[in-house]
Amino acid sequence: MKGDGRAGAHPEPTLKIDNQPLKREGSMTVSFAPVIQKVAPSVVKVFTSTEAKPNASRRGPGLEQFFGEKFRGFEFPDMQGSKPKSGLGSGVIVSPEGYILTNNHVIEGANTVKVVLSPGNEEYAAAVVGVDPKSDVAVLKIDALDLQPIELGNSDQILVGDLVLAIGNPFGVGQTVTMGMVSAKGRSNMGLDYEDFIQTDAAINPGNSGGALVDAEGRLIGVNTAILSQSGGNLGIGFAI
């Protein structure tokens, strides 16, 4: 594992932002492979280890936002509550300096955080350099070279009906891409103080939390955060911030 994961003074991130509107007219796209090839190296796996509390509550049904102990992004089975818990989620590299966006609930309470790059599966210790529980956003930092940061889009310009791609690490199976559309904008009543969610029918499952929601040109327009589900699996109602 590379890096020591300690927080400290860090350089300002260099962000690549594209505010141009999405091109909505033209010939139909038959493959998003070029977009995925561009974006995939920017999406990482996030692994956490947390000292477990005896008899901690387990995940229940309903709105699977994975907040805190009850709704962590995804927890590996733990038969004995006294053992450390391992959790996983996803993250998005947003600058060549190693800054990574994820959800606060993915890393909340974790004693250690590791990031695994794709491709190559290089593993790095990550420092938590910023959190905002009220909006469920966290910023990690790794010390790595030759990172490929994602291009940032403008979520204010998306429209209901725009195609979107969700990229993450559902259930720990590895990087996975799903496609859907923007189902609604401005969703709220999700239990956060600051809410303005993008709703999508792109498949989002436990482990996708913190992953990328990108437009048809591969620009980041949201961070996948929650699903509405009674079973804990995808039912076509996902939310990104």
Q: What does each model-identified segment do?
A:
Residues 2-241:
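Serine-dependent protease modules
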